[in-house]
Amino acid sequence: ATLVGTIGKVSGAHVNPAITAGLWTLKKIPTPNALIYIAAQLLGGASALAIVEYVTNSDVVASGMSTMDGRVFLAEALGTAIFGFGVAAVVMQKLEGMQAAFTVGASLFLGVLVAAMAAPGFLNPAVALANNSWDRTTVIAPLLGSIVGMNVYSFFLAPADSLKSSKKK
């Protein structure tokens, strides 16, 4: 919520590759921008990992999720779907300011709460990379979850004028 409130107007608060991918499927972000955002987000995650390892003079220990666990995958996907649903509501209703920050923050909180029942609750592949927990579950599940959550919102609840504007772009 803090990032939405502070940098949302400047950059759209693009700090999560899963959310960026979901917005791209809704045609809210042009393909070149989505690719640049995702590359920058992953570079940020890798940089954070490198800085922490340098400053602490030790390797960051991974969370230990080296195998595909269906429960963890489902928890990460469902948590990110909830988060993506909230972000889609903000974007498609054109919410701004504290209303946008609260909606994004609340959906992130609920998403992490759900995901944390069986998973680390990253909901963000760049954060998983920064935590040295980059694997199929922490990359694919949030991507799928965000895409599903955003498209469910778009299909069932999006205001008609938000659908028209996304098709013009």
Describe the function of each predicted region.
Residues 1-169:
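Membrane-interface helix-loop junctions and terminal tails of multi-pass membrane proteins
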